[in-house]
């Protein structure tokens, strides 16, 4: 049924998605969402404010209704216009190919000849220990010095506590 066959009252009682379906059926080509809302508003005699109040629900209804298909760049059409195989081709975004110049520049930056290959068999544990120059006696001396400092600190704290207790007793 054509939109021209409906009275103004019948159009106002129809859901916006039903009107959109009729618009697509008449035009028989995809249109942008903006054009669709403009046509619906003009058919219903809607003001800008009323359209703004209902536009979110209208967009949601278009997405949910299985008869409509969102194409690229806010363009909508009827799902029945597109065979299933054609849908993937038209609705999927195109992937841009990477430039080969950038890849060549990266390869030039990485000059792998500068790095020396090291065989794990060539590395011996003895060599590593010699490089680190670990002397266990040095660590023992440091530990003893730390222990002496802690003992001195404990003695000072105990002396201070005793002095504090004596002062309290005198008062």
Curated annotation (Swiss-Prot):
Participates in both the initiation and recycling phases of transcription. In the presence of the delta subunit, RNAP displays an increased specificity of transcription, a decreased affinity for nucleic acids, and an increased efficiency of RNA synthesis because of enhanced recycling. The lineage of its organism: Bacteria, Bacillati, Bacillota, Bacilli, Bacillales. PROSITE patterns: HTH_HARE. GO terms for cellular component: DNA-directed RNA polymerase complex. One of its GO terms (molecular function) is DNA-directed RNA polymerase activity. One of its GO terms (biological process) is regulation of DNA-templated transcription. Gene3D superfamilies: RNA polymerase, subunit delta, N-terminal domain. Keywords: DNA-directed RNA polymerase, Nucleotidyltransferase, Transcription, Transferase. This is Probable DNA-directed RNA polymerase subunit delta. Residues 138-171 are annotated as: Disordered.
